[in-house]
Amino acid sequence: MTVTRDLTILFALTTGAHLGPKTVAALLTHFGNPEAIWDAGVADVAHQARLTEEGTERLVEARGLTDALTEELELIIESGTTPLSILDDNYPDRLRHLPDPPIIVYVRGEVPEETQTAVAVVGTHHADADGIAEAVAWGKGFAQRGVVVVSGLARGIDGGGHTGALAAGGKSVAVLGSGFNNIYPPEHRVLAEQIEHQGALITEHPPRAPLTKSRLVYRNRMIVALSDAVVVVRVHAPESGTMEAVRQARDLARPVYLVGADTSHASVRAVADGAMPIGRLPDFDLVLKYL
């Protein structure tokens, strides 16, 4: 893979100038293409992006770093990571349906085709052994039926879903809230390597980007977008990453199933937000029937 001029400019806007996906998308719409953004005056770009003085200074700095950023992209590629911009044909089509698709995604492994059925298995990272065992069973059962299991590599339910899929020889996709140099949690590094070989790791953050709570929550939109349905094995709190995934699924018209719903505040909120309660015994036919 070679580093294109368009990729370098988009990398400069996202990583150098720290512009978010909606802002960069608006600039692409207004100017037409990355080169036109770069050729425009700083004041014009800053006005269209509604940048503060500090943001404008970052933009000016980023514009002077194109050679260095090109070299950084080349090193990223040499490390085994594939950066794909939203302008690339190989960019995951499912992500294009988001209202705020990542401008660049970084991939290790191979993202399954959009035509391959995929289901997200998500839930609390506070899960007990029984909850994790249920997640493993869901992941394994989906993989045995040729379904890709998507999750977020977190402790608890996420890790269980990935583990089950891999144990069955299936494919799994992990969406990270950090760059690949900062796999989290650290104890899932081996699991991440296995996922890379039997599916894909994907993130919207460059390799050195650290994990933050907001990035963990924000990545849920990608987990949902890459899936045809969402199975929530455990929900711990009404204001959590899992609940954000439920809301994202509702907004993207993805069916959501809540395993073993009870009378807890979190379960009640999940159902109110559109999750369908189902029993603890995995019912794969129910989830896959209308996909």
What are these regions (language model features)?
Residues 1-6, 85-291:
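Glycine-biased, small-residue-rich flexible motifs in mid-sequence functional cores and linkers
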